[in-house]
Amino acid sequence: MSKLNIKGIVKRCDDYGKLVNRYCGPVFVGFATSLITLIAITYFTIIFPATSDFSNLFFIFNFFCDLSISLFLTYGIYFNYIKAIITKPGYPNLNSTLINNINSNINNSNNNKDKDKILIIDNVKWSYCKKCSKAKPPRCHHCSVCDKCVLKMDHHCPWIGGCVGFYNYRYFFLFLSYLWVSVCYVLAHSLPLLFGGYLYSKKYTEIDRLLVIISSIGSFITFVAVGSFGGFHAYLIGSGQTSIENLYPPKKRPNYSLTSIKDNFQIVLGKGDYWFSGLLPINYTPIGNGCDFKLNISNEDNNKNNENNENNENNEIDNHNNNNNNNNNNNNNEKEDNINENDNLISYDTDEYNRHKK
């Protein structure tokens, strides 16, 4: 029997996964949109009216405040989700004459080592993408699903049918944020109905109860999944990282973090007249061109100093161990010499004894 080609099987499965991810993107988008719409319709037609009270002016005022918040959150979800889907993540500017000249020179080179060199373009270190056969700026990575290099690529998301990158990352993160707050709002209104017995009155049908149960379960799953995923991305934004950069070993991880967490959030969400300006569901163009990113030199120097200190400590330990080994070797040599001398003495004494005996 022939041996199984494990690498070939893994590669084939990976290729099939990429095809599914590439061509089934609309299916994931349609499923997510349908689930969000189902929860929204159930909330506004069943859950929200059941929890409203018009007995006095205070409850009437509370009703309009509650309705305004609900409508605003719903608008924030759909706006950011649509913008995350239709906004391109950003690709390297291949129309530049300078970059085209560099690409042609590299492609014409017969030496493969030239393609591994770092390119300096406008005082920025660019690398070379072997799959695209073109130059790419820092933090730009090649997406195997889209088959393109993406500026400041974070990851390929099937739920938006494309990559999350420089130009649509803000919309993606705000979509997660608005969605998580919204499902919290839905659960806060639906749980009293489920456990308070209101749904079992004659006022509601079996379909109403089923819709509320499905919406509550979907909201709870979204609460856990989106909460953990959104919290991870909040950490990435606050530390100036992307999902890909977070996978690097700490010592090899480039540090693009700014002076404070606030600055890191503002560079992604935007800065306005108010503290909440970056959270508003509005059109926004990120700061910069997606190619030029400044490293935090102070932290890089600290990391290098720490590495140098560790290397120095390791060298001192090695030197100490070598000295101990040398001392041990010298001691062993001295012992061997003493043993040889003793052997000679013993043999000499034995000869002398034999002579006297004769």
Swiss-Prot record:
<dbReference type="InterPro" id="IPR039859">
    <property type="entry name" value="PFA4/ZDH16/20/ERF2-like"/>
</dbReference>
<keyword id="KW-0808">Transferase</keyword>
<dbReference type="InterPro" id="IPR001594">
    <property type="entry name" value="Palmitoyltrfase_DHHC"/>
</dbReference>
<feature type="transmembrane region" description="Helical">
    <location>
        <begin position="171"/>
        <end position="191"/>
    </location>
</feature>
<comment type="similarity">
    <text>Belongs to the DHHC palmitoyltransferase family.</text>
</comment>
<keyword id="KW-0012">Acyltransferase</keyword>
<keyword id="KW-0325">Glycoprotein</keyword>
<feature type="glycosylation site" description="N-linked (GlcNAc...) asparagine">
    <location>
        <position position="296"/>
    </location>
</feature>
<protein>
    <recommendedName>
        <fullName>Putative ZDHHC-type palmitoyltransferase 4</fullName>
        <ecNumber>2.3.1.225</ecNumber>
    </recommendedName>
</protein>
<feature type="transmembrane region" description="Helical">
    <location>
        <begin position="57"/>
        <end position="77"/>
    </location>
</feature>
<feature type="transmembrane region" description="Helical">
    <location>
        <begin position="210"/>
        <end position="230"/>
    </location>
</feature>
<dbReference type="GO" id="GO:0006612">
    <property type="term" value="P:protein targeting to membrane"/>
</dbReference>
<feature type="compositionally biased region" description="Low complexity">
    <location>
        <begin position="305"/>
        <end position="332"/>
    </location>
</feature>
<keyword id="KW-0449">Lipoprotein</keyword>
<feature type="region of interest" description="Disordered">
    <location>
        <begin position="302"/>
        <end position="358"/>
    </location>
</feature>
<dbReference type="Pfam" id="PF01529">
    <property type="entry name" value="DHHC"/>
</dbReference>
<feature type="glycosylation site" description="N-linked (GlcNAc...) asparagine">
    <location>
        <position position="255"/>
    </location>
</feature>
<dbReference type="GO" id="GO:0016020">
    <property type="term" value="C:membrane"/>
</dbReference>
<feature type="domain" description="DHHC">
    <location>
        <begin position="127"/>
        <end position="177"/>
    </location>
</feature>
<dbReference type="GO" id="GO:0005783">
    <property type="term" value="C:endoplasmic reticulum"/>
</dbReference>
<keyword id="KW-0564">Palmitate</keyword>
<feature type="transmembrane region" description="Helical">
    <location>
        <begin position="28"/>
        <end position="48"/>
    </location>
</feature>
<dbReference type="GO" id="GO:0005794">
    <property type="term" value="C:Golgi apparatus"/>
</dbReference>
<keyword id="KW-1133">Transmembrane helix</keyword>
<keyword id="KW-0812">Transmembrane</keyword>
<keyword id="KW-0472">Membrane</keyword>
<dbReference type="GO" id="GO:0019706">
    <property type="term" value="F:protein-cysteine S-palmitoyltransferase activity"/>
</dbReference>
